[in-house]
């Protein structure tokens, strides 16, 4: 498996990001899937991008982190694609999700973004 993550994220922060995703899914707006997330990042709409680490082949998501860096969108790596799919409300695994409107998770997303910036 290719090593995509440039920084280690504490499990506590990963869990908080998944919790924020679930809240944003219910009260805001999210974009599910690599193509939809890529469009949200390119348009500058992504508030937080969640990327599954266990995607094969890794080339499918290899562009997400550099694009997020370029567009100043905070991103976090999630260990498991099934976990990411479940948190985004899908019955299947998911490679990438972008939170576009955080809804009631707004403060949570801002806090996660600040902590991620400090880790880099």
From Swiss-Prot:
Organism: Methanosarcina barkeri (strain Fusaro / DSM 804)
Protein name in UniProt: Large ribosomal subunit protein eL8
Localisation per UniProt entry: Cytoplasm
PANTHER family referenced in this protein's UniProt entry, alphabetically: RIBOSOMAL PROTEIN L7AE FAMILY MEMBER
Functional note: Multifunctional RNA-binding protein that recognizes the K-turn motif in ribosomal RNA, the RNA component of RNase P, box H/ACA, box C/D and box C'/D' sRNAs.
Source superkingdom: Archaea
GO biological process per UniProt: ribosome biogenesis; translation; tRNA 5'-leader removal
Self-association and partners: Part of the 50S ribosomal subunit. Probably part of the RNase P complex.
